[in-house]
């Protein structure tokens, strides 16, 4: 039981929260490309991303695992994102720091989605049962390359007017 829910029910809740984080994050990145802040969608993205990390830490932990490492990294990156946006208000270098951190937060959610897809989706699991096979590595490399490109474009395009 986790928070009064079966592990299965809690897992479904965690996945729904994560999918909301990914969906809203993609909208936020689209806003960056158009130089729009999208404050409500951004708040949803950051909140659900934080909730994804928090709920991820509530699963049973048996020693340090790559999943735990990604969760810790996600929290650090999210803290930088929040600081750049809400404390420094995207002023000067904080604008591009925010872009990098926000897109990295989204990337980490997608990275875990890919990992879990290869674990849970039988067709993908058959291609890479241990996540060390080429189909898994190629997929993760492609996702990383796409997110690097997204980050570079967002850094150039995201130049919102200063908040008053």
Where in the sequence are the language-model features?
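Polytopic transmembrane helical bundles with strong interfacial aromatic enrichment
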Residues: 2-164
């Amino acid at each position: 039981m986790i928070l009064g829910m079966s592990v299965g029910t809690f897992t479904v809740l965690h996945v729904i929260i994560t999918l909301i984080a990914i969906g809203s994050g993609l909208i936020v990145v689209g806003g960056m490309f158009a130089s729009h802040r999208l404050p409500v969608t951004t708040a949803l993205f950051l909140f659900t991303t934080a909730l994804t990390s928090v709920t991820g830490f509530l699963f049973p932990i048996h020693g340090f695992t790559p999943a735990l490492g990604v969760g810790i990294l996600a929290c650090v990156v999210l803290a930088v994102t929040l600081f750049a946006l809400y404390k420094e208000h995207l002023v000067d270098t904080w604008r591009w720091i925010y872009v990098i951190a926000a897109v990295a937060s989204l990337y980490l959610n997608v990275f875990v989605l890919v990992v879990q897809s290869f674990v849970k989706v039988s067709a993908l699991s058959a291609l890479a049962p241990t996540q060390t096979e080429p189909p898994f590595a190629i997929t993760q490399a492609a996702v990383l390359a796409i997110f690097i490109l997204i980050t570079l474009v967002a850094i150039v395009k995201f130049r919102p007017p200063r908040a008053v």
